[in-house]
Amino acid sequence: MMIKGTRCTLVKVVTPACENEFEMRISMKLILAISVFITTALVLNVAICRAQSAPQQDVVQKQSRPSQQGEDVVRVNTNLVQTDLMVFDKQGHFVDGLQREQFELSIDGKPQAISFFERVRAGSSREQALKSNSDRTAIIPAEKPTAVNENRGRIIVFFLDDLHLSLDSLTRTRKMLTQFIENELGDNDRVAIASTSGDIGFLQQFTDNKSVLHAAVERLRQHPYNIRDMTRETTPMTEYMALTIERKDDPGVFAFYVDECLKTAPPRYPRRSCEVEVVNRARLILVQAAAVIVNTYESLESLMRTSAQMSGRKLVFFVSDGFLLDTGPRNADPRGKLTQITDAALRAGVVIYTIDARGLFSGQLDATNNVPIDIHGRLENASLREGPASQDALNALARDTGGRALRNTNYFDKWVNKVLDETANYYLLAWRPNNEEQTANDFKKIEVRVIGHPEFTVRLPHGFLSATSAALTKPTVTAQPAPSAHQEMQQALTSLQPKREVPTSLSVVFLDTPEHGPVLTVSVQIRNETLSHEEVGGKQVAAVDVVGAAVNDKGKPVETFQTRLKIDATAPRGTAQNDSVTIYNYRMPITPGLYQVRVATRDSKSGQVGSAQQWIEIPNLSLRRLSLSSLLLGLQNVKSKESSGSAAGVPQVQFSTDHHFARNSRLPFITFIYNAARGQTGNLPPNVWLQARILRAGHVIKTSPMQQVTVAVQDFARIPYGGEISLDSLPAGEYVLQVTVTDQTTRENASERARFTIE
């Protein structure tokens, strides 16, 4: 078959016999699909020109999809205040099976009736429903667990206080993060790596993409702790020594620094002048330290409020070398900021676990910690107190939000794993404030105990701000006019969580082509049944605006697109025939790198919006390393609705966009193998072997035999491979297809993964 001067030969694959339930084979239909897909890619230059010169052109395709039933819900009063808690026995094991009547709740020491109680499994769909509303307007689905959405994954944040991290601590932290990404990240987990300095930039967002998280780790840099001493003194003064002088806690410390001042002062220099210099020096150090600490608190509180947009419980690992909880009476009281952080954490469903990144730490500082030596021992007591004092803030953050603090260990990657295990289950309880005292303008202390079990340890957030007080901590927002359609689209495009008013699915596919090199295909799918139709020319027509952008890892858009899709209703609304979807495809040339594709949709009649986003890494094929294209799942012949200049109505290949498949169906997939070695002379056939695996919740449940890819093609730079997998024996649920290719000549490996759902 000749296409624009390029010869394409049909694929021939030799596969060993295998079980029917995991059949790996190439069908004639799949062979045709590969050829059609290559054809589509080869005429890419035409498609790109049309998309740029005529952004309003419709590229509409339809395919059937089963409708989904809505869930029954129970609505709970908006005044409910809820908190989660964990109960542990003396051995540190979670105590399961407790009932509501076994708990005693008190607010500011006064008994409070429990209005709602339930044991929750972290990462479940039940948890997502229970904690779906940050203002406690809880919409609680009836208990109908389903296999499809049984595991929503964990929401985890690693917040690195890099303004208080030494180089050694940063090295340990990087090692811990890398170990977590490679070995502990679950298929449905959403993880964010954030820092006080903001060095991570655009990559500081929730994702399950390992490449994004590794790139975020690579951006971590040490920030030298620049608390500068503006005086002529050479004797180092630590922040805690400065605080001791400011508070007048230890006369010996003050006397030591005054004596050191006199040693370098001119003859007959008054001792009183040195006393003033020492006090001023201490205050200057504390002012600078307070500014850095406030920056850390502000960044952490901002993280708490941003994470409130994500439904479900969140675990935050706060990593720091520690800092002072108090910087003296002349600086702002940090305890007020801590109460705001605690309140924001409770409202966002956040539990903070703090890690002292200094590792094994005796608590006593020495010369390596910039502490002067006093032969008279006047600094000894203060030095002993300095280590624990630097951990007070870490202890308070963990204690007040229901977490724990890790201290004095060099291997905190294992502790992270332990925390993830111990927080896998918890109890959720809620109450309704019933008197004026609970709505007064102050911080409310929460206490919970298990009746008859004083040996149990109960961990929970220690308090919250009343509604009035919480409102005072937020900036005043003036009334704003209703957003325009353009603003609504922009808000949906930049939303932290996908908008679901218009159910929108996104598929991003990388493919390398002979004429155009790397190509990115963006497929946007919209469910037609949710759209508002109006009669135009005797037909029921809906209009949907679509905008999208491909953004690089610096947050800079490299390609944008927009269009309006006009969709005809082919059957009465609500009928099975109308349960279809519309797919819009946009193709663009792309250079190697890490990209995020964001799309937003808007029903022009109802104003409802939808959004989706996806990361993709484009390999640099010029490095001649073994690589794979994206996995293309599903296969269906559809009719194009392209207008003038195209083959209108000609059947085309459309791969699945939402990756949803029916039980007892088959899962076709296609991938392309790049840069397979051909021996030292470059003339030998590639010796490439391939294996497919299906995973669920991180566990391999099916594996195909290793198969040699035997092909008869002229372009060995792009070796196509496809297969079909029987889904007969798999229950409904969420899965991952992983395809791994091994080049026996170079011993290189490459793999690609794609999620799919069996309904």
Language-model-derived ranges and their functions:
Residues 49-759:
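Scaffold/interface architecture of coatomer-like assemblies
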Residues 24-31:
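Positively charged n-region of N-terminal signal peptides that target proteins for export
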Residues 1-2, 24:
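Methionine residue identity
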Residues 33-45:
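Bacterial N-terminal signal peptides
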Residues 11-23:
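Acidic, Ala/Val/Gly-enriched low-complexity intrinsically disordered segments
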Residues 2, 17-18, 31:
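Extended hydrophobic/Leu-rich segments
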